[in-house]
Structures are given as C-alpha cells and as structure tokens.
C-alpha cells in the first residue's frame, strides 16, 4: 500500500514539474513576467520562445500559439527575426519603425490610412507590397510576396481571413487592442520586439512608457476637479462609446476625468442611439473627438440637430494629419499627457506630443 501511495505521489510530482517545459524536452522555460497584459504569455527556452495568446472573446480558449526560433526545425515554428512580414496595420508598422525594423515589413494593407512617409515611399518604390484592404486582402499579392508571417488584427465573429489562412503562412494575430488597460496593450511591444530580434530594446521602451505613465497618473490623481468627459461623435445614427472594461475608459480615469458613460458594461465599444447619448451628454464639461479630416461644429449640428444641446467645448484630433493611431497604442503616456493638459490646465503640464486642439467654432446660440 505504501508503495502504491509513493508511486502516485511521484507521478503527481513529475506532472507538476512539467508545467513550463517545451514539447519533447525536459528543459524548464523561463516565463516572462507580464505586469499588465492579460492575454499574452511568453516563455523562453534555450533554443526557442513559446508565445500563447489568450482568446479575448473566450478567455478559456487560445487565439494563437507560436514557437519562435532561429531555426525552422519542428512543426509550427516561426523563424525569427522576421525578414519579410505582411503587417496589415499602420499601428504595428509604426512600432516596427520605432524598433528600427522597417526592412522586416514586406507588405501592408489600407495604404490610404497610412500617415507614415517611410511606408508610403516604400510602396511607391516597389519595396513594399500593397496588399489592399485588411479585411479582404489581395490573395495574389500575398502569394507573390510569400511573407514569412502575416500580422493582422482579429475581430470577433469576422470569419477570419478566408483563403489567406489556407496558404500555409503563419498568422500572428495582433490582439493587443483587446487588452483592458493602456499599459496592458503597450506591454505587447515586448512580444513584437521578440519577433524582430529587438527584445532588449522593446523591454527598455516599455519600462520607460510604464514609468512615465504612472508618474502622470499620480499627478492627475492630485487634481482637485474631475471634469465630466464625453468622447467621440455619432456616425450613421449611432454613437459608439468605450465600455467600462475598455482601455479607453481606463485612460480617461487615469487622466482624472469623470467619464459620463463609465456605467456601460462590457469590453470594447458599445453602440448607442444618438438620442440616448445626448440625454446624458448635455452635462459634459469637455468633449473630445477623433475625426479623419476637417471638423466643423456648425456642420455637425446641421447634420445631427440633436447635437445642438451639447454645450461643452470640443477638443478634436484630425487623424488624417496626426500620428494618434500610429503612436499612442504603444505609447499611451503621450496621449495621457495630452488629455491631462486639456482636463487639468491648472497642473501646468506641457505635453511634448499634442494630438488634440480646441475646435474654434462655438455651438449655436453662444
């Protein structure tokens, strides 16, 4: 009896010790401590790195699992550093640029929304392939490019990439935008840095981002007021607002704002009718809007008369001329600094990066 108990104990002990071991190896991996990212796990071994992406829409499942190695020996492995990747988003291209890895990008999508001159020039000169629309990429162009990996952003219930997924090219899902805190998303820079051989540099950048972000949070926490904040504007009769579980809602709180729709449960954006939003928005102190192209308040009211009831001053960002979308996902401290300067001018913060400007046109009747 004692012999059987000893055997069972030995088996349990053996299994428990295999938790962070690579497949087919007795080596114990070193798990990288992620301080904020909830959907990312990185375990390093002597000859490769294993990365697991948790499914943000079903947290009991896995969105992707990758084995990064300098050798292609072994099924399911991705050779790093990437040499010719298809990077669908300007957000991630901007990060590759910051990490001095422009040469690792062989193709991009949605060129019309790129504000990065290096990549526009690359497409014009034929060094970078234009792969078309990110939701329906050009299959022929991808085949011609023959990238070593494809980096798209996943969307819930989108059906994936269709025939592209059958090409046999590794697909690395860039689900960083589904993290529920700004620093959680920014921490993904550590993953992307490992894809392009810039791990130490990426870790250093994130450390600086974290330090500055927390410093700014402390300053905003000491502010004596909490202005009521209204974000975004309606589109086609609907007003999509950040839910309480989104990184945007967390950012507003960290900036010392009272987000008027912090009661919205869920993650990501929540679409509401314009009427429902305006009922509460009339109490806003500050209205911030991101808009692709020029913005005119009188035209907004002409298009949607209900907006005349909102008297809050507008601060807007023209995303066609600024690098808001390219810079701030992995540098939330830059956006936080700008928002604190808008919400709490009494703190005397002078932002190095300015994305929002006051919209000069006053609301009708003022």
Segments predicted by a language model, with ranges:
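Bacterial Sec-dependent N-terminal signal peptides
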Residues: 1-24, 339
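Bacterial Sec-exported substrate-binding components of ABC uptake systems
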Residues: 17-93, 201-230, 342, 347-366
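A short, structured surface patch at a secondary-structure boundary
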Residues: 49-52, 57-67, 74-143, 149-156
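Second-shell loop/turn segments in exported
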Residues: 75, 80-84, 95, 127-133, ...
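Extracytoplasmic ligand-binding site segments that recognize negatively charged/polar headgroups
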Residues: 92, 108-117, 159-161, 175-190, ...
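Soluble non-cytosolic domains of exported or imported proteins
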Residues: 132-137, 154-158, 179-186, 200-207, ...
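Structured C-terminal subdomain patch of bacterial secreted/periplasmic proteins
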Residues: 179-207, 214, 286-366
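Flexible, glycine-rich surface segments
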Residues: 211-299
């Amino acid at each position: 009896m004692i012999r059987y108990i000893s055997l069972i104990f030995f088996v349990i002990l053996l299994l428990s010790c295999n938790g962070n071991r690579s497949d087919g190896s007795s080596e114990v991996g070193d798990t990288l401590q992620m301080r904020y990212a909830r959907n990312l796990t990185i375990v390093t071994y002597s000859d490769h790195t294993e990365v697991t992406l948790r499914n943000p829409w079903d947290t009991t499942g896995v969105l992707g699992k990758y084995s990064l190695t300098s050798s292609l020996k072994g099924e399911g492995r991705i050779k790093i550093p990437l040499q010719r990747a298809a990077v669908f988003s300007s957000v991630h291209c901007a990060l590759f640029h910051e990490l001095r890895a422009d040469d690792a990008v062989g193709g991009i999508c949605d060129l019309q929304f790129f504000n990065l001159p290096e990549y526009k020039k690359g497409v014009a000169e034929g060094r970078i392939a234009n792969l078309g629309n990110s939701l329906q990429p050009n299959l022929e162009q991808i085949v011609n490019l023959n990238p070593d990996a494809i980096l798209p952003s996943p969307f819930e219930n989108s059906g994936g990439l269709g025939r592209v997924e059958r090409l046999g090219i590794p697909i690395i899902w860039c689900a960083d935008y589904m993290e529920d805190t700004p620093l959680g998303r920014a921490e993904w820079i550590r993953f992307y840095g490992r894809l392009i051989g810039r791990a130490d540099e990426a870790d250093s950048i994130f450390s600086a981002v974290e330090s500055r972000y927390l410093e700014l949070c402390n300053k905003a926490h000491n502010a004596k007021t909490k202005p009521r904040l209204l974000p975004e504007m309606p589109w086609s009769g609907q007003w999509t607002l950040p839910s309480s579980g989104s990184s945007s809602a967390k950012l507003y709180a960290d900036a010392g704002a009272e987000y008027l729709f912090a009661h919205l449960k869920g993650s990501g954006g929540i679409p509401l009718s314009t009427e429902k939003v305006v009922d509460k928005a009339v109490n806003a102190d500050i209205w911030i809007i991101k808009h692709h192209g020029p913005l005119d308040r009188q035209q907004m009211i002409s298009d949607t008369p209900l907006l005349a009831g909102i008297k809050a001053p507008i601060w807007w960002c023209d995303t066609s001329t600024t690098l808001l979308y390219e810079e701030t996902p992995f540098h939330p401290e830059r956006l936080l600094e700008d928002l604190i300067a808008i919400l709490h001018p009494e703190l005397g913060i002078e932002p190095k990066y300015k994305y929002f400007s006051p919209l000069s046109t006053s609301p009708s009747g003022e």
